[in-house]
Amino acid sequence: MKVRNSIKALKKLPGAQVVRRRGRVFVINKQNPRNKARQG
């Protein structure tokens, strides 16, 4: 999982889902799990 300042680019990729957990923003991608990231 990458920790990014901005997850804007990752959320545009196919299969990406934006999820809020514990006050942090996560991007989960089941199609391509390499694009997993957290902001904050």
Curated annotation (Swiss-Prot):
SUPFAM superfamilies: Ribosomal protein L36. The keyword Ribonucleoprotein applies. GO terms for biological process: translation. GO terms for molecular function: structural constituent of ribosome. InterPro entries: Ribosomal_bL36, Ribosomal_bL36_sp, Ribosomal_L36_bact. GO terms for cellular component: ribonucleoprotein complex; ribosome. Disulfide bonds: none annotated. Keywords: Ribonucleoprotein, Ribosomal protein. It holds the Pfam family Ribosomal_L36. HAMAP family: Ribosomal_bL36 (MF_00251). PANTHER family: 50S RIBOSOMAL PROTEIN L36 2 (PTHR47781), LARGE RIBOSOMAL SUBUNIT PROTEIN BL36B (PTHR47781:SF1). Belongs to the bacterial ribosomal protein bL36 family. This is Large ribosomal subunit protein bL36B. The gene is rpmJ2.
